[in-house]
Amino acid sequence: MIPGRMNSREMRRLMAQMGIKSTEMDDVKKVIFVGKEKDYVIENAQVTMIEAQGVKTFQVVGDFRETPKKQEGKKEETFPEDDIKLVMDQTGVAREKAIEALKAASGEPAQAILNLTQK
């Protein structure tokens, strides 16, 4: 232990005495903060949730980057990969055609499959 500093075990003990809980959130890989003009993305995130007096605070460490917002008029639809693969497998069409069919069917895979097989 370095003179004048506490080791991590001692720090955790003192925090517990003060009613502060610290929890590592190991399953988090990415954190995104959505802003008005930009999004702030933290990849390979290490997140710690600290709870004190009923208030939860998050500490995030990782690779930071900013991304500009996409144009609102150019909103691109995205569909779950499972839905796209299902349409492709059931109808034998290419990926682009499956996505077009999902767009026409408002994202409903069953309707997209019916539309493609009835043509």
Swiss-Prot record:
Classification lineage: Archaea, Methanobacteriati, Thermoplasmatota, Thermoplasmata, Thermoplasmatales
Family in the record: Belongs to the NAC-alpha family.
Transmembrane segments: none
Described purpose of this protein according to its UniProt entry: Contacts the emerging nascent chain on the ribosome.
Alphabetical keyword list: Protein transport, RNA-binding, Transport
Protein name in UniProt: Nascent polypeptide-associated complex protein
Occurrences of domain NAC-A/B (ranges): 5-73
GO molecular function (one): RNA binding
Known partners and oligomeric status: Homodimer. Interacts with the ribosome. Binds ribosomal RNA.
Gene name per UniProt: nac
A UniProt-annotated Pfam family: NAC
GO biological process: protein transport
SMART domains: NAC
SUPFAM superfamilies the UniProt entry points to: UBA-like (SSF46934)
Annotated InterPro entries: NAC_A/B_dom_sf, NAC_arc, Nas_poly-pep-assoc_cplx_dom, UBA-like_sf
Superkingdom of this protein's organism: Archaea
